[in-house]
């Protein structure tokens, strides 16, 4: 069996497998099909190799592993014990004839039927709560796959053949998880504006996660929460910056069911233990979640939809998430509603929250101004970081990362203007590791940095009427060098001499003109007289 040897070749091979679907639907639709089938192959391959090793008949060949599995599964003497071990260790079972390897064999024989794959999906979903409804967004009988059942069958079979040669089980854990992340990022690029609901660009995720973990990289059992988790990309960055990644406990909430299922798959592919993931499919701005311990977290990371609509029902004034701040976020701009939800779930001691929002939250008035003032009076806002424009897939507007903490001993706010920290990309601006490092170093120092960072006292903020617009605090104006007056006079004289020379040349040419009639000649002479002054 052909296998990919490096993460980059795996990434490319996975992306190439999308070619079959790319001509039939847009990326926002075909991502569910491709990612779902990759996930099914991962579960199938992992199971086959697990059985072969458990029965002490280890092999690198999926076909041989399937043969081992089939023999023990169909043997009445070993069937019950094998199923028991698989349920205990894997939490799922795929029948031999429904494994990805068996289905691909039928594809090659020309006997594959879509119902076989659909049954495999159903069996996984019914095997454990962890997998419930996981494949519900994958409609194998959609007209998008083909106008007829035969065409639909052919499309799915072609994708399966592309995926069959990939060694996904051999790349299990972070490499496969990162490959999945790569695909999600590629889909985000292809999807354009639709991508914002499920993906946070890695440089921004990296910045926010490192800030959340700063000084706590060695902490065991670090709890992290994203109330608008999308595909889980932002949450899963924790694995990269915790020195005890297997002990990190993840809490996430997502409204969109398709995206929620994507996050569930992403967690499993990254090898997050079942007992360390708590994901919820619901509206963050409706009933509160989580409501059972733990309800407060070491880190809160959020990239909510910007200026979204929400109910802003007056009943929320009695909700402990919002009631301390006297006002509700406007119905047409839920930004502060998301922020206050996340802040409510932050631990009192040493909790750190990072949220990405549009700049309007820094200076808009009315209800938002009241909420902002209350947060500042409480000392909740620790740092404001201005990001470059056009770094997100779903918007070109500049955004800000706001860092919040509870129980601070002062109320100053550190401002970082990182709006120029980017490289120009083909369609978007790109923040590099060097840009992120510059921001992090400033954040750690909280020192004055000319044209980049400023530590504003609470008194200074009050003087600015609680307006946090970054240019009020960080002056990035570049003075132009003043040219000496003698140089300016010299240039004026040179210009005047050039004008005189050109005027003389023009007059010489005009003097050679003659009118074709006495009237025209008189008119021309009058013009020359006026021109000479």
Where are these regions (language model features)?
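Residue-level signal for short amphipathic helical patches enriched in basic/charged
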Residues: 28, 171, 219, 245, ...
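A conserved structural/catalytic subdomain of Rossmann-like adenosyl-cofactor enzymes
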Residues: 5, 287, 294-533
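Non-catalytic, mostly N-terminal accessory regions of nucleic-acid modification and defense proteins
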Residues: 1-212, 275-284, 386-389, 411-419, ...
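Hydrophobic alpha-helical segments and their boundary regions
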Residues: 6-7, 25, 170, 185, ...
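Hydrophobic helix-cap positions at the C-terminus of alpha-helices
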Residues: 21, 215, 345-346
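Conserved S-adenosyl-L-methionine
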Residues: 194-302, 307-316, 322-328, 336-337, ...
């Amino acid at each position: 069996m052909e296998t990919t040897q490096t993460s980059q070749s795996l990434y490319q091979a996975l992306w190439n497998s999308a070619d079959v679907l790319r001509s039939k639907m847009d990326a926002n639709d075909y991502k569910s099909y491709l990612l779902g089938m990759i996930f099914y192959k991962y579960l199938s391959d992992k199971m086959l190799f697990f059985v072969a090793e458990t029965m002490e008949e280890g092999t690198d060949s999926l076909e041989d592993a399937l043969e081992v599995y089939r023999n023990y599964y169909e043997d009445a003497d070993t069937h019950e014990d094998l199923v028991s071990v698989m349920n205990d260790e894997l939490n799922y079972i795929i029948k031999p004839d429904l494994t990805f390897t068996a289905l691909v064999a039928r594809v090659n024989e020309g006997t594959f039927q879509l119902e076989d794959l659909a049954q495999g999906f159903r069996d996984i979903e019914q095997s454990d709560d962890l997998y419930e409804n996981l494949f519900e967004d994958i409609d194998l009988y959609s007209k998008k796959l083909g106008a007829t059942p035969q065409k639909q069958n052919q499309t799915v079979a072609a994708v399966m053949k592309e995926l069959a040669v990939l060694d996904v089980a051999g790349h299990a854990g972070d490499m496969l998880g990162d490959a999945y992340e790569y695909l999600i990022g590629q889909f985000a690029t292809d999807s354009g504006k639709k991508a914002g609901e499920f993906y946070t660009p890695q440089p921004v995720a990296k910045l926010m996660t490192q800030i959340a973990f700063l000084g706590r990289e060695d902490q065991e059992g670090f709890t992290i929460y994203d109330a608008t988790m999308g595909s889980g990309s932002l949450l899963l960055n924790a694995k990269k910056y915790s020195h005890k990644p297997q002990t990190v406990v993840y809490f996430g909430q997502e409204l969109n069911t398709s995206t929620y299922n994507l996050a569930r798959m992403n967690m499993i592919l990254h090898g997050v233990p079942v007992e360390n993931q708590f994901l919820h499919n619901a509206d963050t701005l409706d009933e509160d979640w989580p409501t059972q311990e733990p309800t407060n977290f070491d880190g809160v990371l959020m990239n909510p939809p910007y200026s979204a609509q929400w109910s802003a029902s007056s009943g929320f004034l009695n909700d402990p998430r919002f009631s301390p701040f006297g006002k509700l976020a406007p119905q047409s701009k839920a930004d502060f509603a998301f922020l206050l939800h996340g802040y409510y779930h932050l631990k009192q001691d040493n909790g750190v929250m990072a949220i990405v929002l549009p700049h309007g939250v820094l200076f808009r008035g009315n209800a938002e101004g009241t909420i902002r003032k209350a947060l500042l009076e409480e000392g909740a806002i620790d740092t404001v970081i201005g990001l470059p424009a056009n770094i997100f897939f779903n918007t070109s507007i500049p955004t800000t990362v706001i860092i919040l903490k509870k129980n601070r001993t002062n109320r100053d706010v550190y401002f970082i203007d990182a709006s120029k920290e980017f490289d120009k990309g083909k369609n978007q601006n790109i923040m590099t590791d060097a840009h992120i490092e510059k921001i992090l170093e400033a954040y750690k120092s909280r020192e004055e940095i000319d044209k980049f960072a400023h530590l504003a006292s609470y008194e200074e903020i009050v003087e600015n009427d609680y307006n946090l617009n970054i240019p009020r605090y960080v002056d990035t104006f570049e003075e132009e060098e003043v040219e000496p007056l003698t140089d300016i006079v010299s240039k004026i004289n040179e210009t005047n001499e050039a004008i005189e020379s050109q005027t003389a040349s023009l007059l010489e040419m005009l003097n050679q003109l003659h009118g074709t009639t006495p009237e025209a000649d008189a008119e021309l002479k009058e013009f020359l007289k006026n021109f000479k002054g």
